[in-house]
Amino acid sequence: MSNQYQEEGCSERPECKSKSPTLLSSYCIDSILGRRSPCKMRLLGAAQSLPAPLTSRADPEKAVQGSPKSSSAPFEAELHLPPKLRRLYGPGGGRLLQGAAAAAAAAAAAAAAAATATAGPRGEAPPPPPPTARPGERPDGAGAAAAAAAAAAAAWDTLKISQAPQVSISRSKSYRENGAPFVPPPPALDELGGPGGVTHPEERLGVAGGPGSAPAAGGGTGTEDDEEELLEDEEDEDEEEELLEDDEEELLEDDARALLKEPRRCPVAATGAVAAAAAAAVATEGGELSPKEELLLHPEDAEGKDGEDSVCLSAGSDSEEGLLKRKQRRYRTTFTSYQLEELERAFQKTHYPDVFTREELAMRLDLTEARVQVWFQNRRAKWRKREKAGAQTHPPGLPFPGPLSATHPLSPYLDASPFPPHHPALDSAWTAAAAAAAAAFPSLPPPPGSASLPPSGAPLGLSTFLGAAVFRHPAFISPAFGRLFSTMAPLTSASTAAALLRQPTPAVEGAVASGALADPATAAADRRASSIAALRLKAKEHAAQLTQLNILPGTSTGKEVC
């Protein structure tokens, strides 16, 4: 800031001298930009009341208004302008006013739209036009340059750092990651004097406009020493922009496609400059796409969409880091046999475990609670599917309707096969005895006071076998059935139970008749005294009898039960 403007601002607000010179006190900015602004005074037709330094500055400014952005010596006539005011009021700086400025704005906007629609990936974008929007009006995305310029033309009193559009790519991080010899420039102050969190308007225009845009203002070849000192950082940035054109184009297109591809899942709303940059990058894209760009453009073709882990790049994020996040996906969980056994055991207890049960299972099985929950959801769906399929394909002749025929413990021993396989649920001797008694029951006269079975051909429910009092209470058990239970009680082998079940009816009647005179007390004593070895011997004898008689499935007692 030159001394004459500091004196001019401090004459009205004397307390501004106590402020830090590097932070550009808000009082000085208010007096320079707000009250003594040549723009506002010329807009009001009060140019005759300008002080001498500002009036002397107005004529060179009018002379330089129409000059292009990349002219060789844009600031030769107004070397007294400090760099901050030069950014604001110089050519391409975003504060050109009236007359030629408005015409240049319309022409440049039309040129920007045409070039954006027709240019190739390396097409030259037009110089950014001056703002034609009213103060505070947001750009509508007609072009990246117009968007950034209009954002820079916010109202004097309401211009804040938070209103400036975010830069679409973090320049220093992306250059550093791409291996470019990048020396970060000193943090430039923005219009309000804050440390350079948001770059000045020329840099915003250069970044948003893409690599094909013209060099930013101040990149001229002026030979004056003071001009080179004032614009040294801007020239460095322009040279880097030309050298790293390919990297910046690739990163801009990556970020633009990420913003356009996933607008719904993006938590950060794209600002005007970023949206315009995205539109320009996609519109100017021509020819073949590299494999990396095709992967970015159609990520679902390569990896499938995963709603949990899809990541949207925000406007200020680093594009390479976001690309790595987008490539991650959750693979299918592979369960070990032990984990599956434990999960199945828990599923047998309850189909809907609570959160504590799920967490306990997860800790015990070294899984996450979410994986356990998803497993139970899938298992319930599979169970419902099997249940529905079993109910639809159930033949009418089976004793148990629907899925009960597949899940009931006694179902393998009630079908037509002569020697059914071992069923793990048949580990209770009482259940085996009840099955044998039910198999022998139709061939014997029912004992007095006992419940009668349904007629032949009617399906037998679970309560018929296990819930009827005839199999539970000793008072309803005749001596013949007591003897049968005494021989069946200690059985643990399914083959023995199957052999007794498939035994022909005369053999069962003979076995029952041999103990017909025994009372229930004697039956209980025999049940306690009998040994497993004797029962195994009897089972072998029964198997031998079955082999000798050559029993066919049609004459088995399983058919008689039905």
Swiss-Prot record:
Subcellular localization, as worded in the UniProt entry: Nucleus
Any GO MF annotation of the entry: RNA polymerase II cis-regulatory region sequence-specific DNA binding
Composition-biased stretches (Low complexity): 141-155
Renumbered residue ranges of the record's region Disordered: 1-21, 50-81, 118-255
Biased composition (Gly residues): 207-222
DNA-binding region: 328-387
GO-annotated cellular components: chromatin; nucleus
Tissue: Expressed predominantly in fetal and adult brain and skeletal muscle. Expression is specific to the telencephalon and ventral thalamus. There is an absence of expression in the cerebellum throughout development and also in adult.
UniProt keyword terms in alphabetical order: Developmental protein, Differentiation, Disease variant, DNA-binding, Epilepsy, Homeobox, Intellectual disability, Lissencephaly, Neurogenesis, Nucleus, Transcription, Transcription regulation
Compositional bias annotation for Acidic residues: 223-253
Residues spanned by motif OAR: 530-543
GO biological process, one term: lipid digestion
Feature: compositional bias, Polar residues: 160-172
Effect of P353L: In DEE1; corpus callosum hypoplasia and simplified gyral pattern observed in one patient; reduces sequence-specific DNA-binding; slightly reduces transcriptional repression of LMO1
Compositionally biased intervals (Pro residues): 124-133
Record has DNA-binding as a keyword: yes
Purpose: Transcription factor. Binds to specific sequence motif 5'-TAATTA-3' in regulatory elements of target genes, such as histone demethylase KDM5C. Positively modulates transcription of KDM5C. Activates expression of KDM5C synergistically with histone lysine demethylase PHF8 and perhaps in competition with transcription regulator ZNF711; synergy may be related to enrichment of histone H3K4me3 in regulatory elements. Required for normal brain development. Plays a role in neuronal proliferation, interneuronal migration and differentiation in the embryonic forebrain.
Disease linkage: Lissencephaly, X-linked 2: A classic type lissencephaly associated with abnormal genitalia. Patients have severe congenital or postnatal microcephaly, lissencephaly, agenesis of the corpus callosum, neonatal-onset intractable epilepsy, poor temperature regulation, chronic diarrhea, and ambiguous or underdeveloped genitalia.
Family listed: Belongs to the paired homeobox family. Bicoid subfamily.
Alphabetical list of PANTHER family matching this protein: ARISTALESS RELATED HOMEOBOX, HOMEOBOX PROTEIN ARISTALESS
Protein name per its UniProtKB record: Homeobox protein ARX
